[in-house]
């Protein structure tokens, strides 16, 4: 089997899908996308297409290494997101050629049920609570929310109390049986994040995501040492090399590699194995395609 061409389809507001065509009339599907940067990722895919034409898509690891290592500048959000979608399409073709689901090729199913969470927001606390109650009624046992306003390097007492009151009200509405996580989106400085987490601790956050920018491992370690709340990060990190320091230093409790950004299916599986060796949890990230 040989790759004959790559075809990209963009769908607003932020989806992009790859079709990898072959000489056997099999098509592999992938999702090479980076939020807000779809045209740039598309150009990266077209650049990689030149290498892929005429190659056997079933040599997934070989092509991944060739595409990643072949350039002087490696990695980063654009190139690795393009490579992620290409790698997904190659896995899809391998599974289709063997008439075997990809999860079987990866070692088979290990569980029958997986806990998922719903992201919930609202312009007002009342709206947030109403939506959260509805999701809990649907059966979601974990919800995640965030603080919408822009955050200065240091915020005043009123800001901290407002955010805390909103989360406390939500906790009282859904009760202790529903876990509540918070996404800081890396908007908080390490100093402000430490203060904010301390204020939220009495309301038992399930985890806090991106308490500061993900590349600041020193700050994450300091935050980890200052709280009992589990910390999470990883959606803006790329490849096993990007996660290595974070894992070795056990800077967070939960890693969130994104299947469309971190390098694809096989690369995320490697990251998960590295995390397992350090007793860290993995929650694969992907809020993209349908």
Each model region followed by its residue ranges:
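Glycine-rich, aromatic-flanked loop segments that form ligand/cofactor-binding clefts
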Residues: 87-123, 127
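Structured beta-strand/loop patches that form or line metal/cofactor-binding pockets in enzymes
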Residues: 1-29, 33
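Metal-dependent enolase-superfamily TIM-barrel catalytic cores that perform enediolate-based chemistry
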Residues: 113-226
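Conserved, mostly hydrophobic/aromatic
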Residues: 3, 25, 48, 86, ...
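Shared catalytic-loop signature of beta/alpha-barrel
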Residues: 43-48, 62, 198, 204-207, ...
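Metal- or metallocofactor-binding catalytic centers and their adjacent structured scaffolds
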Residues: 21-98
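A generic structural signal for well-ordered alpha-helical segments
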Residues: 94-95, 174, 224, 275
């Amino acid at each position: 089997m040989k790759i004959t061409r790559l075809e990209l389809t963009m769908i607003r507001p932020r989806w992009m899908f790859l079709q990898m065509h072959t000489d056997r009339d099999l098509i592999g599907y992938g999702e090479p996308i980076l939020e807000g940067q779809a045209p740039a990722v598309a150009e990266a895919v077209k650049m990689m297409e030149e290498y892929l034409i005429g190659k056997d898509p079933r040599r997934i690891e070989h092509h991944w290494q060739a595409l990643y290592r072949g350039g002087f500048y490696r990695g980063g959000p654009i190139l690795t997101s393009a490579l992620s979608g290409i790698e997904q399409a190659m896995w899809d073709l391998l599974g289709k050629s063997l008439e075997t689901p990809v999860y079987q090729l990866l070692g088979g199913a290990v569980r029958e049920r997986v806990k998922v969470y719903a992201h919930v927001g609202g312009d007002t606390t009342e709206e947030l609570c109403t939506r959260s109650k509805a999701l809990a009624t649907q059966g979601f046992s974990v919800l995640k929310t965030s603080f919408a306003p822009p955050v200065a390097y240091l915020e005043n007492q009123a800001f901290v109390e407002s955010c805390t009151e909103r989360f406390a009200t939500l906790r009282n509405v859904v009760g202790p049986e529903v876990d509540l996580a918070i996404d800081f989106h890396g908007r908080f400085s390490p100093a402000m994040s430490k203060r904010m987490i301390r204020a939220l601790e009495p309301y038992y956050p399930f985890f806090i995501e991106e308490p500061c920018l993900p590349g600041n491992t020193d700050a994450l370690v300091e935050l980890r040492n200052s709280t009992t709340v589990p910390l999470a990060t990883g959606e803006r990190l790329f490849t096993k090399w990007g996660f290595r320091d974070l894992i070795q230093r056990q800077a967070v409790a939960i890693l969130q590699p994104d299947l469309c950004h971190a390098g694809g299916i096989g690369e995320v599986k490697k990251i998960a194995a590295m995390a397992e060796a350090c007793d860290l949890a993995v929650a694969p990230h992907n809020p993209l395609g349908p």
